């Protein structure tokens, strides 16, 4: 089976074929997800919450992400591997270059950065030097203290237009993928239609080109608050690989995310 690349995902978008992504943090789970056909694996800074037990993602370091990226890389053959750049690891273009290089050398195919217009120079410099970028808009968890909590973004017209404008600008700067998180489904639709690059949604409705979830939510092993946009597939299947297959099938046929997982 051929490896998934950014070109593969672009082809999927052009064909109207939905694709799936999951977080992964170790070789064993990554191998299972890869083997069942998950297209994209993200070593997310969500590990700060689901693995390290923090209340948010801010304590995660580049060294943490690099370690787990190396673990995941050893377990996969097909999936595209994206590594999150953690809080304050890309405050300047120079800092971003150094830390992104570390993550690419750890085995990532692409790095993910949260932010809008202020990131444009950084995105351009990274892509010009051979480091592919996945951008991230909407609810950006590293800005949780600015937002005043984990809240849906883009519900008013002004902020919705700002997010659309930032999405277009990030694409023009060289981003090859975009994640949109916790935004109204109508806004996600507008962004997906406005961009040539694939758009991956989480809590953003069913019209994005792909969907991503945190593996701990999919497998029902998260502690504490479970986001509305998530679904426990292990509960309905009883087996990890079957849960992953059910997730893939429901994204492909459009039954996930449903209205109960979507914000308006």
Swiss-Prot record:
This is 3-methyl-2-oxobutanoate hydroxymethyltransferase. One of its GO terms (cellular component) is cytoplasm. Belongs to the PanB family. Its EC number is 2.1.2.11. SUPFAM superfamilies: Phosphoenolpyruvate/pyruvate domain. It is found in: Cytoplasm. 3-methyl-2-oxobutanoate binds at residues 45-46, 84, 112. It holds the Pfam family Pantoate_transf. One of its GO terms (molecular function) is 3-methyl-2-oxobutanoate hydroxymethyltransferase activity. Its cofactor is Mg(2+). It comes from Shewanella oneidensis (strain ATCC 700550 / JCM 31522 / CIP 106686 / LMG 19005 / NCIMB 14063 / MR-1). The active site is at residue 181. Its main location: cytoplasm. Keywords: Cytoplasm, Magnesium, Metal-binding, Pantothenate biosynthesis, Transferase. Homodecamer; pentamer of dimers. InterPro entries: Pantoate_hydroxy_MeTrfase (IPR003700), Pyrv/PenolPyrv_kinase-like_dom (IPR015813), Pyrv_kinase-like_dom_sf (IPR040442). It is an enzyme of class 2 (transferase). Mg(2+) binds at residues 45, 84, 114. The keyword Cytoplasm applies. Catalyzes the reversible reaction in which hydroxymethyl group from 5,10-methylenetetrahydrofolate is transferred onto alpha-ketoisovalerate to form ketopantoate. Pathway: Cofactor biosynthesis; (R)-pantothenate biosynthesis; (R)-pantoate from 3-methyl-2-oxobutanoate: step 1/2. GO terms for biological process: pantothenate biosynthetic process. It comes from the Bacteria. It catalyses: 3-methyl-2-oxobutanoate + (6R)-5,10-methylene-5,6,7,8-tetrahydrofolate + H2O = 2-dehydropantoate + (6S)-5,6,7,8-tetrahydrofolate.
């Amino acid at each position: 089976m051929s490896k998934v690349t950014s070109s593969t995902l672009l082809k999927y978008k052009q064909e109207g074929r939905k694709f799936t992504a999951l977080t992964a943090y170790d070789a064993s789970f990554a191998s299972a997800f890869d083997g069942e056909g998950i297209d994209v694996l993200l070593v997310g800074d969500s590990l700060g919450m689901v693995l390290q037990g923090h209340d948010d993602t801010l304590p995660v370091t580049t060294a943490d992400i690099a370690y787990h990226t190396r673990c995941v890389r050893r377990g996969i053959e097909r999936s595209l591997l994206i590594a999150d750049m953690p809080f304050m690891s890309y405050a300047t273009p120079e800092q971003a270059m150094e830390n992104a290089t570390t993550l690419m050398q750890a085995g990532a195919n692409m790095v993910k950065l949260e932010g809008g217009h202020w990131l444009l120079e950084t995105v351009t410099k990274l892509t010009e030097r051979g480091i592919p970028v996945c951008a991230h808009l909407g609810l950006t968890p590293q800005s949780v203290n600015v937002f005043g909590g984990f809240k849906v973004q883009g519900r008013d017209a002004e902020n919705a237009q700002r997010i659309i404008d930032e999405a277009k600008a990030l694409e023009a700067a060289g981003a090859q993928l975009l994640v949109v998180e916790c935004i109204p489904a109508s806004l996600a639709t507008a962004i997906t239609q406005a961009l040539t690059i694939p758009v991956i949604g989480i809590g953003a409705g069913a019209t994005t080109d792909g969907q991503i979830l945190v593996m701990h939510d999919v497998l029902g092993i998260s502690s504490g608050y479970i986001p509305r946009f998530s679904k426990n597939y292990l509960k309905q299947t009883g087996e990890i690989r079957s849960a992953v297959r059910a997730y893939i099938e429901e994204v492909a046929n459009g039954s996930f995310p449903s209205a109960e997982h979507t914000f308006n």
